[in-house]
Every structure is written in C-alpha cells, then in structure tokens.
Amino acid sequence: MSQIPFTVSARTAKLIGQENFSNAEGAIIELVKNTYDADSQYCFILFENIGTLNATIYIIDFGCGMNDTTIQNCWMTIGTDDKLFNIKSDNGRIKTGAKGIGRFALNRLGNYTTMYTVPEKSDIGYKWTVDWSYFDKPGITVSDLSLIHI
C-alpha cells in the first residue's frame, strides 16, 4: 500500500480555537499574552461599536513584530514548537505560550481578522487577513488557505 499523508480540514483549525478558548475574555487574554511574548512594554485594547454589527476590537502592542520568516514558520504553522525551544524573549521574558495555537483565539472574537505587524528595525510591514467563515466551507483543507498579504 502506498503512503497516504494526513489531510487537515480547515474546519479542524477553527475548532482548535473554539475548544481552547471558550469565551471572548479568554481569547483576549491569550492575545495579550502574545504581546508579552513579543516584549511589548504596553498593550492597548480598544472596543468600538460594541453591541452592533460593526463591533471592532483593537489589540495594539509595541512588540518586536514579525518578519516574513517568523510569519511563515511560527504564525502560519499550527502547533509550532517555537516556544518550546525559544523559551525566552530577546529581553529575557519567559514566554507564556506553548501549544502554538494562540492565533486561533482570534476566531472567538469575530468573523473577520486583520493583523498588521512591522518587524523591529524595518520599514516593511505585513498585513494578515482572514475571514473565519471560509474555514467552514466543505472540502477546504488548511493547505488551501493562503492568508498573508505584504
């Protein structure tokens, strides 16, 4: 018999967020922990139009940002082991995340996510967008999703 690789449905990735982050408060805490891991001195959480269809949550930090390699190897890798081997931040903080699934907390907060990141000492930034409803489409696998824009 030939070797058959695993295929992961996009729906599974969405379920990771729903099972690990039971409510919006837990999801926000997870994202604030990410700002800590990025050595941000400050984290601002702004709520806009809460209770309406245009509700928006902004989580703004001043951390180290991500370059394209970090986005590909860490942010876009489900279950990354990066924090197992890089347990301290550049400023010596013990990193709080360990499972490599924190980005799925975003799914708990709304149907659409946009993330902007600018790596330290760089003039080039990245924009990451996702429509979480796309993860529910039948037959879509994780490898079908390409979500990063430069």
Language-model features: where?
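GHKL (Bergerat-fold) ATPase N-terminal catalytic module, capturing the glycine-rich phosphate-binding loop
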Residues: 1-148
